[in-house]
Amino acid sequence: MFLVKMVLGFLILLSPLCATGLDVSQTDIIERSLNFLLFAGILWYFLAKKLRSFLRSKSLEISKRLEEIQAQLKVSKENKKKLLKELEQAKEKAELIISDANKEAYTITQKYELQTKMDVENLIKNSKALMDLEVKKIKRELVESVFKDLRESKKVSFNVQDCVNILKQRL
């Protein structure tokens, strides 16, 4: 079949030469064409099986490599899916960790705010208590110094009951 196609193709290529009106008898184109066709046929006869086997082996080689590449591609796609799942899980875990950390930070902040508030209230109470003690101490010292001055001046006389009443009223 191939040989027939070659001969027809060759004749089609030679058809313009026949139409030109040249004298073909003085050229050896027909002999050369027949020699070429004979040479091509002999080459085809001897090399066809080897060429076919070579082309089949190359085709099988290419098919095997294609299958290997497709297998690698499939493995790569599976790995990609696996890694994407792991990435999603890692993102979810990170979000969970962040939300837990925010909750914990809020709880710790509230705890320290409450502790600080209680400490401030205790400091205020203690300072008020200290101020009250200091005020009482100063009043007592003032009253004592006034009584001492009054006793020493001897212009005013007090008995013990009057002193006790004055001290009770003032302190």
Swiss-Prot record:
Protein name according to UniProt: ATP synthase subunit b
Cystines in this chain: none
Localisation per UniProt entry: Cell inner membrane
TM regions (residue ranges): 2-22
Gene Ontology MF terms in the entry: proton-transporting ATP synthase activity, rotational mechanism
Keyword Ion transport belongs to the record: yes
Self-association state and partner proteins as the record states: F-type ATPases have 2 components, F(1) - the catalytic core - and F(0) - the membrane proton channel. F(1) has five subunits: alpha(3), beta(3), gamma(1), delta(1), epsilon(1). F(0) has three main subunits: a(1), b(2) and c(10-14). The alpha and beta chains form an alternating ring which encloses part of the gamma chain. F(1) is attached to F(0) by a central stalk formed by the gamma and epsilon chains, while a peripheral stalk is formed by the delta and b chains.
NCBIfam families linked: PRK08475.1
Main location: membrane
Membrane topology according to the record: Single-pass membrane protein
General function of this protein: F(1)F(0) ATP synthase produces ATP from ADP in the presence of a proton or sodium gradient. F-type ATPases consist of two structural domains, F(1) containing the extramembraneous catalytic core and F(0) containing the membrane proton channel, linked together by a central stalk and a peripheral stalk. During catalysis, ATP synthesis in the catalytic domain of F(1) is coupled via a rotary mechanism of the central stalk subunits to proton translocation.
SUPFAM superfamilies attached to this UniProt entry: F1F0 ATP synthase subunit B, membrane domain
Domain of life per record: Bacteria
InterPro entries: ATP_synth_B-like_membr_sf, ATP_synth_b/b'su_bac/chlpt
GO cellular component: plasma membrane; proton-transporting ATP synthase complex
Family in the record: Belongs to the ATPase B chain family.
